[in-house]
Amino acid sequence: MGKGNAKNSGGGDKKSKAKAGDAKDDSKGKMKGAQSVNVRHILCEKFSKKEEALEKIRNGAKFDEVAREYSEDKARQGGSLGWKSKGELELPFEEVAFSLEQSTTGNPKIGEAKTGYGYHIIMVEGRK
């Protein structure tokens, strides 16, 4: 598990350029104070495969369907990792996951991270 790079990018028409670690304190409380997230991811060992998956999502494919096709981990569950608390995930992944806004598989707000496992495309379905 080496150093990783983290970056966020939005899916669909809305692009999220939030930096890992940014905390947004708006009236809905979406970003600040979450201690756990319900997270999905697509894991690809190869950068080129990750880019193909990203392209499908950006062209309107549902996140869970792309996960079943491209992910090398948790593909049968549509990429679902379930609820994860702070400290349970590798730091680059965690920083992105906790900085993302909640979204749906049909209109995901996605982020990217690189860990020792490979390249991750990440989305968050819930926060608490």
From Swiss-Prot:
GO terms for molecular function: DNA binding; peptidyl-prolyl cis-trans isomerase activity. Residues 34-126 form the PpiC domain. It catalyses: [protein]-peptidylproline (omega=180) = [protein]-peptidylproline (omega=0). Residues 12-29 have a biased composition (Basic and acidic residues). SUPFAM superfamilies: FKBP-like. Gene3D superfamilies: 3.10.50.40. Residues 1-35 are annotated as: Disordered. One of its GO terms (biological process) is rRNA processing. Keywords: Isomerase, Rotamase. Its EC number is 5.2.1.8. The keyword Transport does not apply. GO terms for cellular component: nucleus. It comes from the Eukaryota. PPIases accelerate the folding of proteins. It catalyzes the cis-trans isomerization of proline imidic peptide bonds in oligopeptides. Belongs to the PpiC/parvulin rotamase family. PIN4 subfamily. This is Peptidyl-prolyl cis-trans isomerase pin4. It comes from Emericella nidulans (strain FGSC A4 / ATCC 38163 / CBS 112.46 / NRRL 194 / M139) (Aspergillus nidulans).
